[in-house]
Swiss-Prot record:
The modification Phosphoserine is found at S252. Pfam families: ELFV_dehydrog, ELFV_dehydrog_N. Its EC number is 1.4.1.4. GO terms for cellular component: cytosol; mitochondrion; nucleus. Homohexamer. The active site is at K113. Belongs to the Glu/Leu/Phe/Val dehydrogenases family. GO terms for molecular function: glutamate dehydrogenase (NADP+) activity. This is NADP-specific glutamate dehydrogenase. It comes from Schizosaccharomyces pombe (strain 972 / ATCC 24843) (Fission yeast).
Length: 451
């Protein structure tokens, strides 16, 4: 594969290929080598112009994308991201990761991703509404409940999802589950806002139970969290509910480090949620910054002190190799990515070396640890298809079961095809990559995508 202008996609591709080639998979199934050059190319890439009107009446233009990467297991499924950094490399990386993440859930979903370089920050609600509707007017021809089902991601809130859903309904004159993350009154699912954050915590609980053979739980564990969007917010709340101590939360402007022994408390997380609803920064809260330690322009990892667990929940490549080494020195034993590819390639290498050598910082990759969001999106699709709504408890139980299954798939496949190192802790990175790849490759062969 030669794509020097697509560094994020290259990184994601090399991670998958590295896991597979370093394992025994191709010794057992040499025919699967033929899949790699095929699976690395999207089935379809859409790029389109989005023109919209700002509050001053000016015509504005942005670029929109949808990468429909792989549909062997089901309709394309993956979020839409509105952020000025969005480009084809980032969306191909996210779509590629989504293929394997969706496969791990066991639900009938293919992989895709989309978005635009539109920046919601600094825009009025009316401008965001007009852009969202204009975006859907370009995208609606290529999506549908049986074809491609987008959802939210960075910059695409429930407000945006609902305006896109409404525009699709008007354009198609039909009421269907064409997007997920909808309002409960319009076919949304219980637990969807919480799903990714809750899922990360459920996954970490299985890591702790597996490693300690049930002797330890989350209770009393010190947790560093980055980000302050949905994933970070609900991961923090679930950690607190499980008796853990949340030591940090952050945004693009800086990090808030807890100064109290109890860590951040639910009321403070809810205050941060209210700030984010107004598209404000943590730094805008004088009370939080006075009670705790706010560091402008910083990330948690080298500032948080001694911790047991790190949950990167902000964006890709947010943990560098140096920060990974610092986390290990600070006593970190578990890292679970709430963000997609949250650890840089160098950080993954540091964590995996630690795991294999016996120091034992155990990394859970995003495609496994943060699959809870798309899992509940899949459950929302199922509810829409049945014209039914499941209770909060029903969806939460299904989410917990899916996260347990993903963990068990990852450990079982890693144990079968990979060397676990001196401490016999299986590589969740390799296990998740290989387990997802096996499912997709088998389905692709069944539908004639390779032979």
């Amino acid at each position: 594969m030669s794509t020097p202008y697509e560094p994020e996609f290259q990184q994601a591709y090399k991670e998958i290929v590295g896991s597979i080639e370093s394992s025994k998979l191709f010794e057992v199934h040499p025919e699967l080598k033929r899949v790699l050059p095929i699976i690395s190319i999207p089935e379809r890439v859409l790029e389109f112009r989005v023109t919209w009107e700002d509050d001053k009446g000016n015509c504005r233009v942005n670029t929109g994308y949808r990468v429909q990467f792989n549909s062997a297991l089901g309709p394309y499924k993956g979020g839409l991201r509105f952020h000025p950094s969005v480009n084809l490399s980032i969306l191909k990386f996210l779509g590629f990761e989504q293929i394997f993440k969706n496969a791990l859930t066991g639900l009938p979903m293919g992989g895709g991703k989309g978005g635009s370089d539109f920046d919601p920050k600094g825009k009025s609600d009316n401008e965001i509404r007009r852009f969202s509707q204009a975006f859907m007017r370009q995208l609606f021809r290529y999506i549908g409940p049986q074809t491609d089902v987008p959802a939210g991601d960075i910059g695409v809130t429930g407000f945006v999802v609902m305006h896109m859903f409404g525009e699709y309904k008007r354009l198609r004159n039909e009421y269907s589950g064409v997007v997920t993350g909808k309002h409960m009154l319009t076919g949304g699912s219980n637990i969807r806002p919480e799903a990714t954050g809750y899922g990360v915590v459920y996954y970490v609980k299985h890591m702790i139970e597996h490693r300690t053979k049930g002797a330890e739980t989350l209770k009393g564990k010190r947790v560093a969290i980055s980000g302050s969007g949905n994933v970070a917010q609900y991961a923090a709340l679930k950690c607190i509910q499980e008796g853990a101590i949340v030591k940090s939360i952050s945004d693009s402007k800086g990090v808030l480090i807890a100064k109290t022994a109890e860590g951040l408390v639910p009321e403070e997380i809810h205050e941060i949620m209210a700030l984010k609803e107004k598209r404000a920064s943590i730094a805008d809260s004088a009370s939080l910054c006075k009670k705790h330690h706010y560091i402008a322009g910083a990330r948690p990892w080298t500032n948080v002190g001694e911790i047991d667990i790190a949950l990167p929940c902000a964006t890709q490549n947010e943990v560098s190799g140096e920060e990974a080494a610092a986390l290990i020195k600070q006593g970190c034993r578990y890292v679970a990515e709430g963000s997609n590819m949250g650890s840089s390639a160098e950080a993954v290498e540091v964590f995996e070396k630690s795991r294999a050598s016996g120091e034992g910082c155990w990394l859970a990759p995003g495609k496994a640890a943060n699959a809870g969001g798309v899992a509940v999106s899949g459950l929302e699709m199922a509810q829409n298809a049945q014209f039914s709504t499941w209770t909060h408890a029903e969806v939460d139980a299904k989410l917990a079961g899916i996260m347990q299954n993903i963990f068990e798939q990852s450990t079982d496949v890693a144990s079968k095809y990979c060397d676990s190192g001196s401490n016999n802790i299986p590589s969740l990175v390799d296990g998740a990559n290989i387990a997802g790849f096996l499912k997709v490759a088998t389905a692709m062969q069944a539908v004639g995508d390779w032979w």
